[in-house]
């Protein structure tokens, strides 16, 4: 083995470890922080609205900065932006652990979200840079598997840590992991990737896009109130202005031809948006259904719900491997079809549905989502030139986050239509069950349409 081959092998291994740990860390933090929220509320005597901002501030920051940092990474170097992101994430985690008030906690969570955007926009792009077309699907599968493993372990391990070590421990654990990642990226990951280094950064476009996305996401969280619809309208208007701005400058933040002339890229991102819009609220709705309608304790409900991400983590690497051998659109489309079937089955659940059946439906969903996620990522990243890797990864991440918010928005609208502002009590269990069935029915139709978007993407080619 010559020196260059050995160095390339080390780079691939280092990049895969870096992306895998990053994926696990982000999902573990997200799922474990939800378990810790009641304890955080007690520490700072927060009301419900302020407490919700501990989670919301992070999500908004990620969504607002993903695309700008993706472009900055393409211009100044993906490794550089990733390294700064890991350092900032580690520091902001420490700040969250030593937060001294509710406001300081929210501010530090904003910083954590901004630094997470730097990591999200570059980790997959770095993987794409070091793995060839025939290898990256499997690499994506391993990284995506780590995401679902974090989602599975977060509530369990996060709950234990919060109970015995305090909620601060969830943030403190990022310190040694962050230091380890910094060592890997600075000492073992060789080279830099900045194929768009001669381009200028579009600050105006970044501002317009960030404000528009924030308005959209806050609007979705306030549905079905009038303010929610107004913010969504304002966000959509901002996106129209953003598109106009991008067509009238020399170095746009976003190459619109990626959407207009690259069907694979456009349809793969649309499929991702549809998939997350149709699936993200499932865990939220099923958690309420299991605890209220079925009467299960929180730990039993958690064990049932973990079936879905566990199956995802098991089959994602296999799905990525298949997407290297077969057309990614075929594997991803089969996955979305299986998700559609799983959603259709969940549409008919009620208080008499056996627990075993619910677990099987969730496992089917997990299997379908595993088949969809990493092949779809492979299709997106393999359809663009090297200079667009950062921005492509960021756009896909933005589709994921906005899809998640749309999913929760749909859920809030349906619950409001059936139950108004009534609390979930035995008297309204039938109404809640009806709202759940209606929502899952809508999600089934949406996901079925997504199958056609996935199939219609065509074969991968670079633009």
Model regions and ranges:
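Structural signature of transmembrane alpha-helices in multi-pass secondary transporters
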Residues: 19, 23-27, 55-58, 62, ...
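Helix-loop-helix hairpins in multi-pass membrane proteins, especially solute transporters
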Residues: 70-204, 222, 386
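Hydrophobic transmembrane-helix bundles of small-molecule transporters
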Residues: 163-270, 304
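Small-residue-rich segments within alpha-helical transmembrane domains of MFS-like 12-TM solute carriers
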Residues: 27, 31, 97, 113-121, ...
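Extracytoplasmic
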Residues: 14-51, 55, 64-66, 282-287
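Small-residue hotspots at the loop-to-helix junctions and early N-terminal turns
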Residues: 45-52, 141, 298-303, 394
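Central cavity-lining transmembrane alpha-helices of secondary-active solute carriers
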Residues: 56-70, 120-124, 306-319
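12-transmembrane solute porter fold
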Residues: 14-21, 33-34, 146, 165, ...
């Amino acid at each position: 083995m010559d020196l260059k081959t050995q160095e390339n092998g080390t780079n691939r291994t280092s990049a895969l470890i870096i992306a895998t740990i990053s994926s696990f860390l982000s999902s573990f933090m997200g799922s474990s922080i939800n378990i810790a929220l009641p304890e955080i509320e007690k520490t700072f005597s927060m009301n419900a609205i302020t407490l919700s901002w501990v989670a919301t501030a992070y999500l908004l920051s990620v969504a607002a900065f993903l695309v700008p940092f993706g472009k900055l990474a393409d211009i100044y170097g993906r490794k550089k932006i990733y390294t700064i992101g890991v350092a900032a994430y580690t520091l902001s985690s420490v700040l969250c652990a030593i937060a001294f008030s509710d406001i300081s906690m929210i501010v530090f969570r904003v910083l954590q979200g901004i630094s997470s955007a730097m990591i999200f926009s570059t980790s997959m792009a770095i993987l794409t840079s070091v793995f060839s077309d025939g290898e990256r699907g499997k690499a994506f599968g391993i990284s995506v598997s780590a995401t679902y493993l974090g989602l599975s372990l977060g509530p369990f391990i996060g709950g234990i840590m919060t109970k015995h070590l305090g909620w601060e421990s969830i943030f403190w654990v990022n310190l040694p992991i962050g230091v380890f990642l910094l060592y890997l990226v600075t000492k073992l990951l060789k080279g830099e990737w900045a194929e768009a280094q001669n381009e200028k950064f579009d600050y105006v476009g970044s501002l317009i896009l960030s404000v528009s996305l924030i308005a959209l996401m806050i609007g979705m969280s306030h549905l079905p109130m009038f303010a929610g619809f107004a913010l969504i309208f304002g966000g959509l208007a901002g996106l129209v202005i953003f598109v106009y701005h991008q067509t009238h400058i020399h170095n746009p933040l976003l190459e619109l031809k990626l959407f207009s002339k690259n069907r694979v890229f456009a349809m793969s991102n649309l499929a991702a948006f549809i998939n997350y819009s149709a699936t993200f609220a499932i865990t939220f709705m099923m958690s309420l259904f299991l605890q209220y309608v079925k009467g299960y304790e929180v730990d039993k409900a958690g064990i049932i719900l973990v079936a879905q991400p566990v199956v995802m983590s098991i089959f994602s690497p296999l799905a990525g491997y298949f997407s290297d051998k077969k057309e990614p659109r075929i594997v991803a489309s089969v996955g979305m079809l299986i998700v559609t079937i799983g959603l259709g089955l969940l549409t008919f659940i009620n208080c008499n549905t056996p627990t075993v059946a619910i677990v099987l439906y969730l496992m089917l969903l997990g299997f379908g989502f595993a088949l969809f996620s990493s092949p779809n990522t492979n299709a997106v990243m393999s359809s663009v030139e090297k200079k667009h890797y950062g921005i492509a990864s960021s756009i896909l991440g933005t589709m994921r986050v906005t899809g998640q918010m749309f999913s929760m928005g749909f859920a809030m609208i349906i619950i409001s239509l059936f139950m108004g502002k009534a609390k979930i009590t035995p008297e309204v269990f039938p109404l809640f069950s009806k709202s759940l069935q209606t929502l899952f029915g809508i999600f089934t139709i949406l996901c079925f349409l997504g199958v056609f978007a996935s199939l219609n993407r065509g074969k991968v080619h670079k633009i």
